[in-house]
């Protein structure tokens, strides 16, 4: 959905 969700998925 949104950027925050994407970043949370990356978890670098």
Swiss-Prot record:
PTM per Swiss-Prot/TrEMBL: Glycosylated.
Keywords associated with the record: Allergen
Entry protein name: Major 28 kDa allergen
Species the sequence originates in: Vigna mungo
């Amino acid at each position: 959905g949104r950027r925050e969700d994407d970043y949370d998925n990356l978890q670098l």
